[in-house]
């Protein structure tokens, strides 16, 4: 019996690619660059399974295909806002993701950005590399204290709770949360957290706000000029969720005009292109989407995607089916 044909749209860690070849007839994207819509349409007609990433835009145009061969999109990553789910369903394509395995590493990056933005680490490094440091002095590059402050978390799933754990138990922070669903008293009690009914209210009562909600149309520009104007003085905003969650023009304006103190971004709207107005903000720390970028996590993500794909072709329901 022939193996199902699997197309992997970006290069995976070697160990995972080798494991994939044992179970599937694998085609790799050797150029390791994002696919065009035409490339994706051709792939949907050619392969039994495709493993896309956040860099692959699977919008309705990409799904405008006849004689589809693809039966499953085993997404490499937990977020799947780059996949138009209704279009996939219309073509009878199963969609899976890779939750759980990247929660800790993404939470670590959120805390990294929080500390860097608060303590002006990016500015300090740039000063040193430019040979502009003139020595220690009491008023040099004063930042914000993290320990004991109030941390607001928007989106309280696995990653949001991992950040709460680090903030509360590691830095003695008070935890505020916003979630569209009611969080159980047991989970709130674990972090001594308070749930807020609106983003605006949370922004006004937090020193730091970290975003951990899904992307997609429902959360596009969830952080915008209107609610940033209601933020507590000195707020520091962190985004490791999805770029579209933040109105980047509004963020740049808030940074320039001291509406908020600083920000840290690991994700961007339209990445890998970065909005030029963000580049000009000295009080903004930026990383190139490194949330899950550890050897262990990237391998676990690949193995999880493969497990979903194997289950599907065995006739079982994949454990991480989202559509």
Residue ranges, per PLM feature:
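NAD(P)-binding Rossmann-fold cofactor-contacting core
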Residues: 169-188
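Phosphate-binding beta-alpha-beta segment of Rossmann-like dinucleotide-binding domains, i.e.
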Residues: 91, 99-150, 162-166, 170, ...
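Conserved N-terminal Rossmann-fold NAD(P)-binding element of oxidoreductases
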Residues: 9, 152-155
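Hydrophobic/small residue at the entry helix of a nucleotide-binding pocket
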Residues: 159
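Rossmann-like dinucleotide-binding domain for NAD(H)/NADP(H)
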Residues: 95, 234-323
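An N-terminal-biased, well-structured beta-alpha scaffold segment characteristic
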Residues: 1-96, 204, 224
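Rossmann-like adenosine-cofactor binding region
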Residues: 58-62, 182-277
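N-terminal Rossmann-fold cofactor-binding loop
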Residues: 10, 177-181, 241
């Amino acid at each position: 019996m022939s193996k199902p044909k699997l197309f992997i749209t970006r290069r995976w860690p070697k160990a995972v690619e080798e494991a994939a070849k044992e179970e599937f007839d694998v085609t790799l994207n050797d150029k390791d660059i994002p696919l065009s819509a035409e490339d994706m349409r051709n792939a949907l007609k050619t392969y039994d399974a495709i493993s896309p990433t956040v860099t692959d835009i699977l919008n309705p145009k990409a799904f405008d295909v006849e004689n589809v061969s693809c039966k499953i999109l085993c997404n490499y990553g937990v977020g799947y806002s780059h996949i138009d789910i209704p279009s996939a369903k219309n073509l009878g394509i199963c969609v899976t993701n890779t939750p759980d395995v990247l929660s800790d590493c993404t939470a670590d990056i959120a805390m990294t950005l929080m500390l860097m933005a608060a303590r002006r680490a990016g500015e300090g490094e740039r000063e040193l590399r430019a040979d502009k440091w003139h020595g220690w002095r009491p008023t040099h590059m004063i930042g914000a204290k993290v320990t004991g402050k109030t941390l607001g978390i928007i989106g309280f799933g696995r990653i949001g709770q991992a950040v709460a754990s680090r903030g509360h138990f590691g830095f003695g922070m008070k935890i505020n949360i916003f979630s569209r669903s009611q969080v159980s008293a047991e989970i709130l009690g674990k972090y001594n957290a308070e749930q807020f009914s609106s983003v605006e209210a949370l922004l006004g009562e937090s020193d730091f706000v970290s975003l951990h909600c899904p992307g997609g149309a429902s959360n596009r520009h969830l952080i915008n000029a209107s609610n940033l104007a209601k933020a507590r003085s000195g707020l520091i905003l962190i985004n490791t969720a999805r770029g579209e969650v933040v109105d980047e023009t509004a963020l740049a304006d808030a940074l320039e005009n001291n509406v908020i103190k600083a920000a840290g971004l690991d994700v961007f709207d339209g990445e890998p292109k970065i909005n030029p107005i963000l580049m000009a903000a000295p009080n903004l720390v930026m990383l190139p989407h490194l949330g899950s970028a550890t050897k262990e996590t990237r391998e676990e993500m690949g193995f999880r995607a493969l497990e979903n794909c194997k289950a599907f072709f065995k006739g079982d329901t994949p454990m991480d089916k989202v559509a």
